[in-house]
Amino acid sequence: MKTHRETLGHWLLQRITAAFLIPTILIANVSTLILLNILLFWHIHVGIEEILADYVHHEVTRNWILILLRVFCLIIIKYVFVFFVF
């Protein structure tokens, strides 16, 4: 069971990443593209992690899904970066 502090930390992390996404979309260059890419997938990852924590009750299944989610996000970040830079 999550403590109040962990829940508050996830809530703040979702709001902070969402707030940083807006200015990085408006500024268009390579460094902000990298930051946008990382922030976007980090925001997606935190959101899906919260959904899994709420609705997947079997711990082993949840851990495997989280591992696969991290691998998926890393692969997609790489492909998006390569698509926009090269």
UniProtKB/Swiss-Prot annotation:
Location(s), subcellular: Mitochondrion
A single GO BP: mitochondrial electron transport, succinate to ubiquinone
One GO cellular component term: respiratory chain complex II (succinate dehydrogenase)
Superkingdom, natural source: Eukaryota
UniProt keyword Mitochondrion, yes or no: yes
Chief localization: mitochondrion
UniProt entry keywords in alphabetical sequence: Mitochondrion
Protein name, as recorded: Uncharacterized mitochondrial protein ymf17
Organism: Marchantia polymorpha (Common liverwort)
